[in-house]
Each structure stands twice: as structure tokens, then as C-alpha cells.
Amino acid sequence: MIEHRHEVAGDEVVIRVVETEDDLEGFRDFIRAHLGFLGLDSETTGLDIYSDDFRCRTVQFGTPHEAWVVPVELGPAYEGAVIDALKAVNGFVLHNASFDLQVFERTLSVPMETMWPKVKDTRILSHLVDPRGKDEGGIGHSLEETVRHYVDSEVADKVKTLMADLAAARKGVTKATIWKKVELFDPVYNLYAGMDPILAARLIQKLAPLVKVRDELIDNEHRLAEICSYMERQGFLLDVEYTEELSLDLKVKESHYNEVALNFGCEKINSTDQVADVLESMGVRIIGRTPSGKRQVNDDLLSKLVMEGSPEVSQFAEAVIEGKKAGKWRKTWVDTFLKTRDSQNRCHASINPLRARTARMSITGIPAQTLPSGDWIIRRCFLADEGHKMASVDYQAQELRVLAALSRDKAMVEAFLNDEDLHLKTARAAWPDREITKDSPERKYAKTVNFGRVYGGGAKTVAEQTGLDMAQAQQVVSGFDRAYPEVQKLSQRLQREAIRNGYITTPFIDGLGGRRLPVDPQRAYSALNYLIQSSSRDVTARALLRLHDAGFTPYLRLPIHDEILASVPADHAEWGAKRIGELMAEQMGPVLIGTDPEVGGRSWGSLYGAEY
């Protein structure tokens, strides 16, 4: 057995590394002495849990003062000891539990269903204490960031960076590849590994007293993490043939437009300076500037030049737009899907159900939240399972209905109760002397204001997004405030709360909410936006909890803000989508937040116009 000693917050801690099967008896003694609760972590060959060559190398268990590192890579005896420990201990604390629990299931055949009920996740707890990221003036939620603030800054700066240091010291090794290449008993590697469960055990001691929310919220946030881990495990079937053809088509398109741009003297369409030089040589005057003072050539300018420029300028601007788009789509999305799919041709997204200041969910791997809205080409890459159809169920004006429910504005509530056109109602309030229909431009301006109010936007935002002058923009904003006076009153109450406390508290409804959202007193107007965004997230989150309880989780693929995507058996697709919609619907106070179920064909893209 190898022993490493280190200091954490003034205390000596010991890390014991199992070397031989004889050492496992000492590990078992340690487990028997701590059956109540332990820190837990794993070290693996990388982050690609579902790739064929993925392995778990070590599993670590620890108290605030002692850790044991078991090298499961050495074979069945070591794996068996860890499996027995995972089953025997009654409670564990991990940081980002979803990853490690998927590792244990994938490599040690320990079902997540048996592990989640006895897990506490310090990443979830840290978010409930302070939901802001480091870039927002908060503490952050990574293990390194939380340890730096709550436990020991020196350990965070020196120990949690050890693997990056190891990679830097080795020729041809990167931070991504060091995990599979480092020697199993490298002392630096063992120190890094053994420290994690010790830090998790210490972190929960610091965080637990600081979490000022209901226990039910803590439990349900863990349940949400559990549900999302099951969706990650399930994966989303990739149409490999279509995706490979799309990759080739995009490559040809990118090459063609690069050639067109080159004929105008632009070697790199991703170089703003080169594009700007060519445009100016054609007589285009570039007025916009970036914060650093460089010429600004963005999509708005290029799109305008395509429509209004001379034939040559239009052709060049189109080549830049289309060439960059083809390159981005291929490299960022299509080729990534092909590269990261598992042996069953399934892509496994990473779903974080508790993200951002407002707790909005985020998805990486399959970037459903950032794909071009309304476009089917990329979405066509993904399929429902064999014998299934794709179903999408989204909420009807989720954020506006949440705004109506929380403000209890009589006119807005009645508009939803009577199924009126809210945007038309706002437009007519802004221009009472005009004859306005659903096709009038005023309705479009009013729609911008309705959603802009949710996001904290005023007349300036409306003017920028609609092209109205400030006087007209102010007119439509004033029309909104006259039509729905309680919204303005709610916003003012929230601003006072934010200035007084430094935060607002969201409403606690059916097990979720009641969280504190920090608000910068200088930007107190953002409080309404935070409230609506966070409360809307909780609507979708409560839907996931109900769907899970009803047994629908195996059919769910992705939660996308106000939409849930599912693969449902073709023979029962209409019923399945309708039932999912019924379970998602929520009566929030006086307002029903209803849903629109839709069944497509085999591909996700079919919901956006694709034939298959």
C-alpha cells in the first residue's frame, strides 16, 4: 500500500492507495467503519463514457481526513471490492454525481437507479447557495471553484491543477489525453484522485448550513439530475448515412464559397480583417466598430449587403455568409455527431438541469438549444427508435403565461382565459386610433414588447429590434404598461426587493422554487426577467418529475427550454404525445400553462418540414 499525506485547511489528511489484493482487506475495514456516509469519486480515461474504449481506472472513497484509492483497472478482485462498497455504504457525497454514477453503471454494472437515492451532489448544493457563475460575480460551481472559496484556496490552486501540470510536463500529451496515459501509481495522479472524495466530504460540511431553501427543493433538484442522467444514458439515435452525406455536402458547399471569396481576394472568410479589406476595396463604408475598435463585419451588415449591395458586393457577402455557415454547421455539429456516437450509433448529450443564475437547463453534445430555429437540416440527423415516431410537446407562450400568473394582471389573465391574441391586444392598446389586425405590422411590434418586457427590455430594446424610432417604441411600451398595469407593479416590487436584499426569491410551487436569485442593485430592472425565466424553468422541471413518475422517462430524449422531445411507439404515437402534453400542462394560479403536442415522422427534422 502507498500512503500520501497532505494538508487541507490546516489538517493533515492521508490518502491510501491500494497496490495489491492483500491491501483490499484494509480497504474493506475502512468501508465497514464508515457505512453511514462517504465522499466518492472516480478517475477515468476521459469524458466519453459511452465510447468502446472508455475505462474506469480508479474509484476513491473518503472522509474529511482519509481517502482510499482502489485501482479497478487491475482486474476483478479490485472491481468486486468497489462494487461491494458501493452497495454497502448508505450515503455518498459527490461533485457532479451524474458523471460518476454513469461511469459506475457503464464499467462496473452498478445501476444508477440503486445509487441515486443515497447520493448528495455538492454541485447542486453550491448552486442553491449561489447560482451565479464566476463570470457573473459569483463563486462558481466547479469543484475547483467551490473548494477555493469554501475549503482551501491553496489546495484548489495547487492540487486541482495537478493533472494539467502533468500533461504540460509530458511531450505530446494534452489535458484531454493525460487521463488515459498517466501511470496508474504515479504519485501526483494518486494525490489528485485521493483528494477529491476528501474535498467532497469537507465541502458538504461547509455548504449544508448555507443552503437556505426547503428540503423538498433539494430533493427534487437531485431527482431532476437523476432523470436527466437517464436521458443521457438512453442517447439519441443518429442517422449515420444521412449525417455522412450532409457532412460531405457541407464540405463541398464550404469549398465552393471559399473559392468565390478567393476570387475577390479574400483567402480566409473567417478573418474579419480580410473580409473588411475586400468590402472597403469595393467601396463599402464600414461604420460599426467592435469594443476593441476594429471594423465590425457581422451578419446584419453582410445580409444587408446581399440585399442592397452592388452585384459584386452582394455575391461576395453571400459567399462569406454561406461559406462560414457551412463550415460552422459541419465542424461544430455534424462532424461532432459522427465522431462522438457510440457503437450503437447513439449520441449522448450532457444535460445540466441546474444552470445559469436562473437555473435554466443547458445541453451540450447535442446543442438543441442553439440549433437554427425552424431549420430541419441538422435536426434531420436524429431519429426516433425503430418502430417509433418523434413527438414534440411545447408550452403555449410559457413565459407570458407565467408572467400573467405571477403578476395576476386581470387583463392579461383574461386574455389567456378567453384565448385572445395577446400581441393584438397590446398593439391596439398602443395605437387605439388605428385599425389593427393579426397581419398588421403593429402586432409584430407589440409581440416584441410583450416578450421584451419578460426579458426586462424597454423602449431602447424595442427600437433596436423593430426599427421603430424611439418615440414610436416608447408609444408601444406605454401601451403595454397601460394594458397590463399589474406587470409594472410586480416589476417595481421586485426591484425594491432586489435593492433591499441583493436578491429576489422565486415562488415555491409543488416542490420547486423558493430559490434566491442574486440581482445587481445597479441592474434591478433585471429582477422581473430572472423571476419569469426561473419560474418558467421550474414549470418544465415539474413536468419532467411528473413524466418520470408516470413512467415516460425511457421515451424522453431532450428537454429544450419550453419543449420536451420524445421517441414514442408509432402505433400509440398520437396517444403518447397527447398524454405527455397532459402531464406537462400546469395550472399556475389563475392561468393554465397548456401544451401543443405534435407527432412527426421518424426524424426529429420531420417536425420542422423534413420528409422522413
Which residue stretches match the model-derived regions?
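Conserved "right-hand" nucleotidyltransferase catalytic core of DNA-directed polymerases
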Residues: M1-E25, R32, F37, S42-T44, ...
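Active-site-proximal helix-loop-helix substrate-binding element of RNase H-like nuclease domains
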Residues: I2-E19, D48, D52-A208, Q296, ...
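Short alpha-helical scaffolding segments that buttress acidic/His motifs in well-ordered protein cores
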Residues: R123, V147, Y189, L224-M231, ...
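Conserved catalytic core of nucleic-acid polymerases
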Residues: V284-I286, M307-S310, H348, P353-A356, ...
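Short hydrophobic/aromatic beta-strand micro-patches
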Residues: Q465, L565-P569
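Helix N-cap motif at beta-to-alpha junctions
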Residues: M470, P569-E574
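Short amphipathic alpha-helices in soluble, non-transmembrane regions
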Residues: G576-M584
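Conserved short beta-strand edge segments in small beta-sheet-based binding/regulatory domains
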Residues: Q587-V599
